[in-house]
């Protein structure tokens, strides 16, 4: 009856069966591991992708780098829009109301495609001006413009990829999105090789490679979620489509705080770069490489966070508040334990991690120091990552977004600016570690107070 033990345990949530601590941990691990592997493979493929583009030369790399933060921001807005609906789907699935879960999915497709088409029109309209607004010169702006135009045209497929992935995760299927995440990365590398090296299309080829990867993977992903999944299969419903305004209103309540957070956090990253820039080229390179190396260490946190969102969403929808709290505490505890271990690994092997990225001794020494400072904050970084995912699963996004923004702008950037004057890049990373520790503590306070449970109710839809 069940494909695997994870399916049986997910069914236990909806059927009201009691679950032992061992079963809960097995379920968390079963949902987390595929997502962790997908996160890590995505980072690795990103490195390979960046290396391929880097071989085009400095101008090509700069032209893509110029608008890279903008493309990430747009992608995060589409992801936030998808989350507003996927949280509701998880709640309805937990409540065993599969019909309404599919209704929400239909609304998500309509609203999300409309939103992505609007962003496409905006992107097409500004693609010629954006590189100059970002400070690009005449030598790279034309290439940046073409790259951004091609990316803008594929935004509906970017949304379809995100919404399909999130809907499957909401239904408890972590394996398919994880496989698709690996496939889209591999496709990106293959198409980039084809367009960049075989067809000699340069920067335009890099954009076409990304576009083709999204096109080729988003459609199968959509078919699996909307036509093949036993819970979400939209062909099961025979009644005509009916517009339900409350689904959209609740999606906005969840998505808008996340979107605002993404915009302001992107701005904070830009300010952080501006603080590091005057410290010199060695500091800039060490900062960049340390961030890259650290990203491999916190991927497990995001994988466990994906599991937390699904489990909290379904148990919250099922009205099993005690089980909801139990999963929240267990996922946060597991995340902190795993990332504490990763922190130890990062502290011990920091020289080797930076050495892989740069052979320059001065960069290696400074980057190693940065990683060792950050290692002490990893458990609290995990607390913030997983607790935020818990809150999102419960539909609680306003106050968590305020915590993220408040600590970033009021603590990290303020401290980084002050400490950089006396301690250089070391001061910037001390500020980062201090802020992550404080952020983690604030999220833990919110977790144990339980106010995240009161923010959203399925029966209010």
What are the functions of these language-model segments?
Residues 1-35, 89-154, 198-256, 312-377, ...:
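Short alpha-helical transmembrane segments in multi-pass integral membrane proteins
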Residues 23-51, 55-56, 72-84, 88, ...:
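N-terminal transmembrane alpha-helices
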Residues 30-49, 150, 161, 184, ...:
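Transmembrane helical elements of multi-pass membrane transporters/channels
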Residues 35, 39, 50-51, 68, ...:
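Transmembrane alpha-helix boundary and packing residues in multipass membrane permease domains
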Residues 44-62, 131-138, 194-201, 259, ...:
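Helix-terminus/linker motif at the lipid-water interface of multi-pass membrane proteins
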Residues 61-121, 158-177, 273, 286-350, ...:
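Small-residue-rich hydrophobic transmembrane alpha-helices
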Residues 164-172, 192-204:
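Membrane-water interface regions at transmembrane-helix termini and the short interhelical loops
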